[in-house]
């Protein structure tokens, strides 16, 4: 009986986590479909604004500026995707691609040939050095539980997360 309970619990939890990891969080948007522009400033370990209200089906252009003194990331994902991405970011630090206040783009390009994740060329994310600007155009296809976060090692853990409310 215990074994059956364990198997049922395992299958339930596994399907819940698997669904979260594979939930469609949206898709790369087209400039011609942009509903509105949201300007975002990244400071050292927080975003301004700290939350976003978005309607299902909206295509948003995020204009992101890093006003902090550290490298920061603006990444649209669910919690499981952030957890999966964090070891990739740690690997970038370990390989001296991602430094405290800069990104070694030559090393990044070289490493990306061996490991695509090291190129950090995700359509849902922008990684910026201090004083840099970038943008993401994202279509929010459905109401899912997502957040914007910085996955530079330690930043997510100290709360560099912005709530995304999709309705």
Predicted regions and their residues:
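Extracellular/luminal beta-rich ligand-recognition
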Residues: 87-108
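Beta-strand secondary-structure signal
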Residues: 37-39, 61-63, 135-137, 147
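Short edge-strand/loop segments of extracellular domains
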Residues: 78-84, 166-167
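Sec-dependent N-terminal signal peptides
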Residues: 4-14
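Extracellular/periplasmic metallocenter environments
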Residues: 20-27, 46, 69-71, 103-112, ...
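N-terminal edge beta-strand
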Residues: 30-60
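Beta-strand signatures of extracellular beta-sandwich domains
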Residues: 73-77
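Asparagine-centered strand-capping/turn motif at beta-strand->loop junctions
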Residues: 64-68
